[in-house]
Amino acid sequence: MQHIRNFSIIAHIDHGKSTLADRLIQRCGGLAAREMSAQVLDSMDIERERGITIKAQTAALEYKAQDGKVYNLNLIDTPGHVDFSYEVSRSLSACEGALLVVDASQGVEAQTVANCYTAIDLGVEVLAVLNKMDLPQADPEGARQEVEDVIGIDASDAVLASAKTGMGIDEILEAIVARVPSPEGDPEAALQALIIDSWFDNYVGVVMLVRIVNGVLRPKDKILLMASGATHLCEQTGVFTPKSQPRAQLSAGEVGFIIAGIKELAHAKVGDTITLAGKPAAAPLPGFKEVQPQVFAGLYPVESSEYDQLRDSLEKLKLNDAALMFEPEVSQALGFGFRCGFLGLLHMEIVQERLEREFDMDIITTAPSVVYEVVERDGTVLTIESPSRMPEVGKIAEIREPIVKVTLFMPQEYVGPVMTLCNNKRGNQINMTYHGRQVHLTYEIPLAEIVLDFFDRLKSVSRGYASMDYEFLEYRPADVVKVDLLINGDRVDALAMIVHRSNARYRARDVVSRMRALIPRQMYDVAIQAAIGAEVIARENVKALRKNVLAKCYGGDISRKKKLLEKQKAGKKRMKQVGTVEIPQEAFLAILQVEDK
C-alpha cells in the first residue's frame, strides 16, 4: 500500500486537463501508441465535442520513479462543470491528492476555485501545475501569484508544464510520488468501498467504479449496497488502464471496477458504500446524499405519435444518467410529454442534445422552471415544480424560492456591467475582492433568475471573460406570483409562468404583445389577457377579419347600413361562442424569450 497513489486533476474547462491526462497515460505506457487518441478519457462524442468531461473515468498506471521503486498511480478524471459538482466531490473523496491545473496564460477561473475548495475541505493534498507554458503569452509568475492569492495554497514549487509538448510531465509524476500521501486503510477489516461513478453497459449491466477503503473484494463475493439495501453477486473485478483489465481481487487503497449483474443504475448510486453481505461494515462511508434536481422543464415530442419513442429514449438515457428524473405530463396545448428534472442548465442542454443526436428525436422544451416551496394556510408545505400545479392564491400563506450563491471572476474592466446584470437579476452582493487584475465577486441570486438566460447575458456583458460557478444555498420567502394567460377567457396551462411581483406587469405586457403578433387572425376578435388570480394585468386584442357588408349600399338611408352592421355583429358573436383558437408552436417559444429589463 505504500506504493499506491490516488490522485485526480482539477481544472477549468479548456485549461488542458484531458490533454494532461493523455500525456500521463502515454508516459506510463498505459496504452499502445496506436490506441492513443486525443482525450482518451472522454468517451462520449458530446464530451469530446464540447471539450468537457461529464462522467468520471479512471486509469491505473505503473510508474517507475527515480528512486527505482515502481508506484501504482490511480488517476481519477473528474468532471469540471458546476452542474456535476456532487460527482466531483465523490471523485475527490476517493483520492489523497489532486493536481490543480491552471492555464498559465489565463490564470484562475471560478470553477477551479469551487472544486479546489471542495478538495481542501476533504483534506486532499493539492499540487499546483501551471499548464500551457508553450504559449507565447504564458505568464507563470502572474498565475502563480493568483493561485496563492485566490485559493491560498503555496504555489512556490508549482510545476511548470505543457501537456501539448510534453514538457514537465516527469516532474509532475515525481511530485505526485513525493507529495501525495499513500492511502490509509486496513485490508483485514470489513469491506467498505465507495462508488465513485456507475454506468450502464449493454453486455454486462451496471459497471461500478469504486475505491476500496477497507477490506478486500473478490469475484463470487456477495455484496450489499448500503443506501438501497440491495444484495448482488460480484461477478468480476478489475482496473482500467484506461482499457478494462480483470484482476483476481481489489484490496484496500485501490481503485477499480466491479460488475455484479445489476440491471438498474438507480441501485448503484454514486457515493454509496459497498460492503459484504456476509460480514457487513458497521457504518457506511460519510458524505452520501441523494442528488436532487434543481431545474425542471417540460419535454414534448413535436409529433404526438412519438410519445412512446420519447419515453424509451429517456429511459435509455437514465440508464447512464442517474440524476435525470422524468414523469409523464399532459398539457392542453402540447399534448403528452414529460416533466424532466435536471441538475442545472448544462445538464439540461446535454440531455436535449443527446436526445436529438443519439435518438433522433424532435422535441419542444418549455421554459425551464425551478422548484418552489409553498406554505399553505393550514401549514402544509408543498413543492411545486411546474406553474400549473400552484394552488389558488387564497390558500397560500407564503412562497419560498431557491437562492444560490454565485461566484464570479472577471477582469476588472468588466466589474460594472456584471454588477448591473446581477442587480437586475435581484442579486444581493455579499463580497468583492481584487486579486491583481482579476476581481472575485460573490452574490446571492434567486435560481429562477439564473436558469433563464443569466449565463448567456454574463458572457455578453463581459465579452466572454467572466466565469461563474453557483451552488444551492437555501429556500427563502419571496414575493412571487403566478401569471396565467387567458385566450378568450380560457386559461392556457402551458403558458403560465411564475415571476416576481415587481416584474410581473412588465413580463405580462411583453408576453401578451408577442402573443398578439403570433396568433393568426380569426373570424372574430380574440382577447389575450394576463392575470394574477382574478386581476387582469395586461391585455391585447387580435382584430377580427371582416367582410365589408356595406359594399353594395350606394348612398341611401343610414338605417339600412346600421341593420347590416348589426347583423354582421350578431353573427360574429355567435361564432365567438363556439370557436376555439389554435395556438401556434411559436407562441410557446415566445414566452421563453422575454428579457427582464
Swiss-Prot record:
One of its GO terms (biological process) is positive regulation of translation. Residues 2-184 form the tr-type G domain. One of its GO terms (cellular component) is plasma membrane. It catalyses: GTP + H2O = GDP + phosphate + H(+). It is a peripheral membrane protein. Keywords: Cell inner membrane, Cell membrane, GTP-binding, Hydrolase, Membrane, Nucleotide-binding, Protein biosynthesis. InterPro entries: EF-4, EFG_III/V, EFG_V-like, EFTu-like_2, G_TR_CS, LepA_C_sf, LepA_CTD, LepA_IV. GO terms for molecular function: GTP binding; GTPase activity; guanosine tetraphosphate binding; ribosome binding; translation elongation factor activity. PROSITE patterns: G_TR_1, G_TR_2. GTP binds at D14, H15, G16, K17, S18, T19, N131, K132, M133, D134. Belongs to the TRAFAC class translation factor GTPase superfamily. Classic translation factor GTPase family. LepA subfamily. Required for accurate and efficient protein synthesis under certain stress conditions. May act as a fidelity factor of the translation reaction, by catalyzing a one-codon backward translocation of tRNAs on improperly translocated ribosomes. Back-translocation proceeds from a post-translocation (POST) complex to a pre-translocation (PRE) complex, thus giving elongation factor G a second chance to translocate the tRNAs correctly. Binds to ribosomes in a GTP-dependent manner. This is Elongation factor 4. It comes from Bordetella avium (strain 197N).
